[in-house]
Amino acid sequence: MDDHDDSPVSPSFLKSDGEIEASLRPKSLDDFIGQPRVREQLALVLRGAKQRGSTPDHVLLSGPPGLGKTSMAMIIAAELGTALRITSGPALERAGDLAAMLSNLVEGDVLFIDEIHRIARPAEEMLYLAMEDFRVDVVVGKGPGATSIPLDIAPFTLVGATTRSGALTGPLRDRFGFTGHMDFYEPGELLRILERSAQILGVRIETDAAAEIAGRSRGTPRIANRLLRRVRDYAEVRADGIVTLPVARAALEVYDVDTLGLDRLDRAVLDALVRGFHGGPVGVSTLAVAVGEEATTVEEVCEPFLVRAGLVARTPRGRVATAAAWEHLGLVPPPDLVFGSIEVRGRTSQPTLDLFD
């Protein structure tokens, strides 16, 4: 595992999240905070199916990690009052693996496949027939004497989750009757999520402290809940157990999470780009060497948020720091900076140091 995966602002699921994250999951569409369009559309799909007494269309949920795709799959099963079977794309290496799982489904069950874009091709091709006709063809024997035996399966609803919808094949994507894209959350939505989580965990937190955590959570509930637990630890050990604004800020400083939600590696990349390469352009490989990381780590882990936050711009010649990046590091951007007009939502001005005096 990459060291950056253990960062408190990593959107990936960590072992430390464990059972605590499960206890914080919403149990119904009404409990689910955020994603209003997806919730409204899903409610219509599910309630329409219940009124008809049929199984709903297959559902594909896409979006970055940590936004609630697994929680939504659990809610779908709960709303339908049926069992949820959970697996993942990498676990389905052979068609037989999928056939065994499908044959054990009861009518109306929900089958959730996480990372469905990573499913093996033989299993994917078997899934086509299962999704359309609720049937699988099991091949018995090998060579010229092999025969295909059709096997009926109970009508079910497939819920697929993916962080890379573009990696899905066309035939698989087309078989989903409903596709919902999960967007990053607004600070106000994260604030409500944190207040709900604090109540469940028994954390005494002031509203402005919760707002501070929400503002550093990269628009991701998983990160917000993880930071809440880390701040709670700090408050219990070094304060009186109450999370106030000063306590929250001090705790987040200890865990190297700055005002924009950048961690140590993010800031190292930004600092190398601005101070080491005068704002760029510079290639990812060169930037990775400068911070002592693999190029894939910089490109896949750090860069997406830096670009989304308006701190880094991708150009044909390489990565370029925006005016917001210079200002976030407390520096004055050069006057001829091409990307100086890019704004960062929620960015506050800081004292700056002019390197060009």
Curated annotation (Swiss-Prot):
SMART domains for the chain: AAA
Family classification: Belongs to the RuvB family.
Stored InterPro entries: AAA+_ATPase (IPR003593), AAA_lid_4 (IPR041445), DNA_helicase_Holl-junc_RuvB (IPR004605), P-loop_NTPase (IPR027417), RuvB-like_N (IPR008824), RuvB_C (IPR008823), WH-like_DNA-bd_sf (IPR036388), WH_DNA-bd_sf (IPR036390)
Sequence segments annotated as region (Small ATPAse domain (RuvB-S)): 186-256
Name listed for the protein in its UniProt record: Holliday junction branch migration complex subunit RuvB
Compartment(s): Cytoplasm
Organism, scientific name: Nocardia farcinica (strain IFM 10152)
Domain notes: Has 3 domains, the large (RuvB-L) and small ATPase (RuvB-S) domains and the C-terminal head (RuvB-H) domain. The head domain binds DNA, while the ATPase domains jointly bind ATP, ADP or are empty depending on the state of the subunit in the translocation cycle. During a single DNA translocation step the structure of each domain remains the same, but their relative positions change.
Catalytic activities: ATP + H2O = ADP + phosphate + H(+)
PANTHER family recorded: HOLLIDAY JUNCTION BRANCH MIGRATION COMPLEX SUBUNIT RUVB (PTHR42848:SF1), PTHR42848
